[in-house]
């Protein structure tokens, strides 16, 4: 837990300590040293915040040194929370003692909320109102985010439940901020850099836990521009693009000079830096995230085009984006300025295909079909982002049934932020809530949100009456079921009906047939699934059929499965299970097994003792044999 050094700094200075200090004489007395020397000593790094608080309480002289210039507490702040220093300007006036106390208070409050989440939301997904506590906290948001990051960086195998909920809270807070920024961005007029900025917002929203900033992306692209300039200097040492300063929006109009820039771009991107279209793994969301495109040096047509466009326009070549079907392109005008132009007055650039320059006919060959002239037109920022998000939406729909549908949820949020009246997507969003079971614990704010969505759909398209009616009925039935729910079900191994249960929660197992590694987080004395599931999974073909214990397991591939006892065996080489929900059920991995968190232990109160016995018998025996 965070220390309380800030409180010590506020203690009243004892009168006797001041008198004793005043009577001291000679150069050996600490308080007689020059202030700069005292400050240097106190900032040396060997003293903790608690030490500084105690020093400040000894006499007025030392308290003044600690607080007057602020350097002492600034150093304590920097050492304790180094990642926050980037948010301060050297010219800002900051009361560092107060800043330290505010940050520490924010950390304590954030940890208190994180600690409460497991008890409140163990049985279901965190509801929409679940984050209201942290949204309503007073103090800078960056302080709360920083504390959540500190929790995530705790020792790898411990505090798993804290990390699980800290990650969810941080994910939510950052996405809300990014979505608000995106909505404000969409209200601004278009300019050439807007394409890149909009793409970075999409990247950030889908990867809120990654350290992605527009400034960093710009810096990486600027380094590419510098390489292009170096190549361009070898082609034409007097090229006007070489005199452009960063941030300028100047354009060169001569076709020959533009062509020289494009030749230099093609050489740097595709020959020198080895960028290429990702044909081998085309349907991968990483191909649409700009920070990944720059890191992995590969992408799909739209992301490669945005990179190419940004570099070209920074060097004065006015390329434009073309929302060509199945293959995003750029167009390069060959006509005279001010003349009436048609689609044949442009060359079309395929950034996915190493910057190849295409005619209209070659564009049709590229996709294997004839298209109308309208599809060769330039598109604005919003349309470009719509296509990017549409690609992510398609990928999200491909996610397996055992996944969290996080990409689908994120892309739906982004699409509806741009186009809030898309009826089919609103319906999909409502169905997704039902499928994932994202319901509130004590209130029905999310149910009401779904009902609002459905009412909005009905207003937009009365023809959807049937689908809306079904979902409304489903929602109201859920409300009634919530009212009838009973308390926590406790399963005792000692009960006669559980005598056949051989394994327990927290044990790392291996599936005999499929070979996957997993950890048990629940069990039933017999199969509790419906007849259809039993039939589809061919349970009757098992020697013991459905009349045997079944186990809920978290699998290393991210799926959750329901496995028969006869198909499981102890994993002789237990390893961590990299499943996103491990922290929901377990607090620690010991190296041989998982320790259930308080909420899971309430439901299986006798399992932990059995786990210890099993681990002792299985893994200790193995160690003895090895010796």
Swiss-Prot record:
F-box domain mapped to chain residues: 27-76
Domain of life, source organism: Eukaryota
PROSITE patterns per the UniProt record, alphabetical: FBOX
SMART domains, per database record: YccV-like
GO biological process, one term: ERK1 and ERK2 cascade
InterPro entries with a match to the protein in the record: F-box-like_dom_sf (IPR036047), F-box_dom (IPR001810), Hemimethylated_DNA-bd_dom (IPR011722), Hemimethylated_DNA-bd_sf (IPR036623), SirB1_N (IPR032698)
Entry keyword Coiled coil: no
Entry GO MF terms: DNA binding
Keywords of this entry: Ubl conjugation pathway
Entry keyword Coiled coil: no
Physiological role: Substrate-recognition component of the SCF (SKP1-CUL1-F-box protein)-type E3 ubiquitin ligase complex.
Subunit structure: Directly interacts with SKP1 and CUL1.
Protein name: F-box only protein 21
Organism, as annotated: Mus musculus
Upper classification of the organism: Eukaryota, Metazoa, Chordata, Craniata, Vertebrata
